[in-house]
A protein has these predicted regions:
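Chalcogenol-based redox active-site neighborhoods
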Residues: 1-181
Length: 181
């Protein structure tokens, strides 16, 4: 049994179909240190922006029935997969950036605990979610982003991975696409 098989599989609700060839808006979000990062920048690196609902913390309970929500579980695993393949991604001229609706402090704790070498941004005010019309779900009166990944080159979304069904294999799909494009 793969790791992904223990998680509820999300259905394709077509909520991200509009994102391919979308121009990244001129929005800056705070990273885990509270420093703002512009997402519409022109870099030599492609950006792999992966959106996730939330990472759990050892000292805090998950929202009630979290494990029953399709696509909710697996954010720590996904982040660790990007972390473990960071050098390969950089070698393919791509830099990962994680984004959730969690606070800067929450992101800081997670990046320190998991030793994440890249930026994890907070869209706590839902600026990017609203600008891109990102798919979300609601739990206990809080909005969470659904898991998806965008590959951005020259401010334009070139590839959309959504829904992400096999979390433990997703990094392989990203690496394959980067090698072929």
């Amino acid at each position: 049994m793969s790791v992904s098989q223990i998680f509820s599989i999300p259905l394709d609700d077509a909520a991200a179909n509009h994102l391919k060839n979308f121009n990244i808006p001129s929005i800056s979000l705070p990273n885990q240190e509270g420093n703002y990062l512009r997402l519409d920048r022109s870099d030599t690196f492609r950006m792999i922006i992966y959106f996730f609902p939330m990472t759990g913390r050892p000292d805090m309970p998950l929202p009630e029935n979290w494990n029953k929500i399709p696509g909710a579980n697996g954010c720590t695993l996904q982040t660790c997969k990007f972390r473990d393949n960071y050098d390969d991604l950089i070698g393919l001229n791509a830099v990962p950036i994680g984004i959730s609706t969690q606070s800067v402090n929450y992101s800081k704790e997670m990046t320190n605990r998991l030793r994440v070498p890249f930026d994890v941004l907070s869209d706590e005010k839902l600026e990017l979610k609203n600008a891109l019309s990102l798919p979300t779900f609601l739990v206990e009166d809080k909005i969470y982003l659904k898991r998806l990944t965008l590959i951005v080159d020259e401010k334009i979304v070139k590839k959309v991975f959504y829904p992400i069904n096999l979390i433990d294999k997703h990094i392989d799909d990203v690496l394959k696409w980067l090698k072929e494009n």
